Structure formats: C-alpha cells, structure tokens
A protein has these predicted regions:
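Active-site loop segments of alpha/beta catalytic cores
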Residues: 1-238
Length: 238
C-alpha cells in the first residue's frame, strides 16, 4: 500500500514569484528518492538490493516497475508547476555504490522513462549521482538528463576529477557541482577557494554548460568563505 500524492501547484507558484531571478527553484519526483533504483534502496538494505539484483533480477525489475508507475503518476500532477529544474537520481546509483553493469540494467531504463515524461511537460532535469560517475558517463548521457550532478572530486568522495568527466561527456550534457564543500569551501583559505573556482571555470566551464557549485551540503562553512566563492564566480566571464 503506497498511495501517490498529487502535487499542489499554488505554493510552488508563490515561492517561484518570491524567488524570481535570485535563485533556481528545484522540484522533485515523489518518493524517498527520485530514481526507482534509489527509491528501492530506501525500502530495503542496499546490500540486499544489490544481491537480489544479481540473484533475483526479475523480482527487482518487478519492484522497479511498480515504483516507476507510481512516479509517472506523480509526474502527471506536476503539469504547470513553476519549477526551474527537476532533480532525479540519487546516490545509490552512483558508481561508488554499484557497478556500471548494474546501473545500465537497473537504472538506465527507468531513469530514461521518467526523464521522457518530465521533458513531455517541458521540465529541465538534473541527474544526481553524488559524484560517483566513473564508468557510467555514457549512461547518464543516454538517460536524457539535461545536467549531471554533483561532479564531486576525489577529495570529497568522487571517483574522477570534474574535468575528466567533462572530457568524456563534452557538450552533450551540462554539469553542476565540482567544488569540494569541505576541504575547499569550508576549511580552505580565500586563495584556495578563488584558485579552485578559476580552475573549474577554465577546465570544466570553458565551453559553457557548467554551474559551479558545492558538491554537497555545507553546514559549517563560514559566511565569508561563501562571499569569496560568489565573488570569484562573478569574475568568470566568457
């Protein structure tokens, strides 16, 4: 028993009108996580899910199909929602958790179906993998997402540098993230922050299609560091 709620559009429009051009209003797809595999990993232990995918793949696909149908039902209620961007995916589909082979079989087809439905309502989609993208770059492109995040560097748990990902995907998909939220943004010096922003702009953002941002949440970052980060980003111009 898992009823699917309908999205209320009025509060979203109110927030969108308040925010205007001062930020990006993100939306979501219903569930503990937006992606089907990722949602399943919240319903059962991820280790058990991985073992089941190898030993009982038909059962896992049946579960994912049930979740997909519910998510598509929710997406229908999103028509007209004033979101700038819809986040899908989730960390348990990253290549730091599962193999590219498992991602291809148990994530790609379901992600693609959701993204097609979202694009049918004229939404832009960003696919979240918590930085573990090595080996699944082509699948992220193939699933139809408009952007890939969080482009986490190895220093904060990713498995390739942001510019390595950029070289592989080129201009086929936008990238969001790239800044180590702890070692650079929280504990780094102003010069460290500025240098990293400029490096990312030159190596990742040189051809456009890049939003320079932290690779994950930052809870203890000094406000002054955020100001340095924002000021450095403003200096990056084409």
């Amino acid at each position: 028993y898992m009823p699917v709620p309908k999205l209320k559009l009025e509060p979203i429009r109110k927030k969108y009108d308040e925010l205007r051009d001062h930020g990006i209003l993100r939306g979501f797809v219903w569930g503990d996580q937006a992606g089907c595999w990722q949602h399943a990993a919240c319903l059962m232990d991820i280790s058990d899910l991985i073992v089941s995918a190898m030993e009982r793949p038909t059962w896992v696909h049946e579960l994912l199909h049930v979740l997909l149908e519910k998510k598509l039902q929710f997406i229908e209620s999103m028509k007209g929602a004033a979101f700038d961007l819809i986040e899908t995916g989730g960390g348990s589909a990253s290549s730091t958790v599962i193999s590219p082979e498992l991602h291809k079989e148990f994530c790609l087809p379901y992600d693609t179906a959701m993204h097609e439905a979202l694009h049918g309502l004229n939404f832009l989609v960003t696919y979240h993998t918590c930085g573990g993208t090595h080996g699944i770059e082509e699948y992220i492109v193939q699933n139809g997402a408009d952007a890939s995040e969080t482009v986490a560097p190895p220093s904060v748990g990713g498995n390739q540098e942001p510019w390595e990902l950029k070289r592989k995907v080129g201009a086929r998909i936008a990238l969001i993230g790239g800044v180590d939220q702890h070692n650079t943004l929280t504990t780094g010096s102003p010069e460290d922050i500025r240098n990293k922003v400029f490096e990312l702009f030159e190596k990742v953002g040189v051809d456009g299609g890049y939003i320079c941002s932290a690779s994950d949440h930052f809870f203890d970052t000094p406000v002054e560091n955020l100001k340095v980060f924002a000021a450095a980003a403003k200096e990056c111009a084409y």
